[in-house]
Amino acid sequence: NEAYVGGPTYAAMDKLDELTLRVVGALVWNTELGLEQIDRIIEARNRFNTPQFNTPSVKIWLDGVMEVHTAALLEPYTDRDDNHRGNLLIAPELLDTIVTRLDALGFQIHFHAIGDAAIRHSLDSLQVARQINGVRDSRHHMSHIQLFDPADIPRLRQLDVVANFQPYWAWADKFITELTTPKLGSERSRWLYPIGSVLDSGAIVAFGSDWFVTSGNPLLGIETAVTRRDPLTNVSDAFIDSERINLADAIAAYTINSAYVNFMEKDTGSIEVGKLADLIVIDALADLALLKPRFPPDIIYPLKIASEKNFSPS
């Protein structure tokens, strides 16, 4: 989670017992500063560390977005004649040093990487960190990962990096058809949001929303991942149909795999005896509605699964 709500706000709500979520936060790496900020980041991790709100992760922005030519690409944008490839926000050599230091300190790295160059340099830095620090259960992950060079897809599994997609973006809206594919050409556009290919490579795929940029409703993301169509109308053409995934994999990406990214898979993410009952009940239709809640929706009841047939308060 890194959703424009500062750590002190979450911490204050937690202290007042008003935080109705379990929040795993990412501490932001300021790309205008250098290694001197590490002490501040360590202090924040120590300060924000309760069962309800903790910050084990550092988020590093590596590039911008495709629509305004700031995503970092391996090859130039095709709609410009100045050989422009976007912008890496951190030089590769410095990135290697940053990631190696943070990894050695036990931080999980959360990359913002949109373009194929940003994705490659993220993976390169994690490979350097692993060579220097050794292998550990780090669960580093990369978010957004819009455009892959297919040669880098197998590296996710090789380096134990989780692919954190926002599946709601993987359909042919105007951001894709008017602001993205014309900048890349058809050959590269084939590798936009290659969720199916990443799954087939054996990498762990988790889903998020990038709320509040787009809806936090996971049902929209699940439908988009399965159909590659507009989930609100289902009338758009399927966008790179070969990258569709099945329903079970889409649900897993939002549940057990997302719990895994947050080191919470022993407590939540699946319906098992002893786990937290973080669940809702829905009907089975595509145009579904949540069933009427038994309790007022602003009241949160902490539950654990006591048996396969009933729940009891924790």
Task: Give a label for each model feature.
Residues 95-100, 104, 202-211, 247, ...:
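C-terminal substrate/ligand-recognition segments
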Residues 217, 229-241, 246, 251-256, ...:
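C-terminal cap of metal-dependent C-N hydrolases
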Residues 1-2, 108-113, 140-143, 206-208:
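Short catalytic-loop micro-motif centered on adjacent basic/acidic residues
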